[in-house]
Curated annotation (Swiss-Prot):
Species name: Bacillus cereus (strain AH187)
This protein's name: Segregation and condensation protein B
GO BP annotations, alphabetical order: cell division; chromosome separation; DNA replication
Gene: scpB
Subcellular location: Cytoplasm
Protein purpose: Participates in chromosomal partition during cell division. May act via the formation of a condensin-like complex containing Smc and ScpA that pull DNA away from mid-cell into both cell halves.
Family in the record: Belongs to the ScpB family.
HAMAP family: ScpB
GO cellular component, one term: cytoplasm
InterPro entries: ScpB_csome_segregation, WH-like_DNA-bd_sf, WH_DNA-bd_sf
Cell cycle listed as a keyword: yes
Keywords for the protein's UniProt record, in alphabetical order: Cell cycle, Cell division, Chromosome partition, Cytoplasm
Subunit annotation: Homodimer. Homodimerization may be required to stabilize the binding of ScpA to the Smc head domains. Component of a cohesin-like complex composed of ScpA, ScpB and the Smc homodimer, in which ScpA and ScpB bind to the head domain of Smc. The presence of the three proteins is required for the association of the complex with DNA.
Matches recorded under PANTHER family: SEGREGATION AND CONDENSATION PROTEIN B
Amino acid sequence: MDRTEQKSIIEGLLFVSGDEGISPEQIAKVLEIEGNEVINILEEMQKECEGAHRGLQIVQYAKVYRFATKKEHASYYQKLIDIPTAASLSQAALETLAIVAYRQPITRTEMEEIRGVKTDKALQTLVSHLLIKEMGRAEGPGRPILYGTTKEFLDTFGLKTLDDLPPLSEENEQMNEADLFFGSLQEISK
């Protein structure tokens, strides 16, 4: 096995070991090479990561090596953490989101007729989470705002297009759309 392949395998081992890391001894056993050779390879890999424009570095903590992100990119990682997810949505917001997903473009009044309650707060939450947006205005008195889902909605729920939404069969149309939608999403993600 050549050095390039050894580095490739070590890189994979570092990845699968996650935050716990992996010791040079463990790597040596897997690759069936000497421990000091593993340390030499790890040091080479550390230098390669430092010199390259890469987002990861190899660090050593408490006799184990692991991948870590670079400190200079911390502000970007914080932005990702700050992006709200569907898990942080209330039941009312999830129900409203399911209605918008299946019935878009749809007005607030139409959503309230389906849900039987006001949707103002849920709509504000969904817009602030970038899951829905204003799609235009309906014809008719007052020209109410039409809502639809966004690209972020598709990304959040692992959908490529709206066509990937689980279909509503005639018998399921009587079910709560939120229950059907999120139950079907669980099936997709298995």
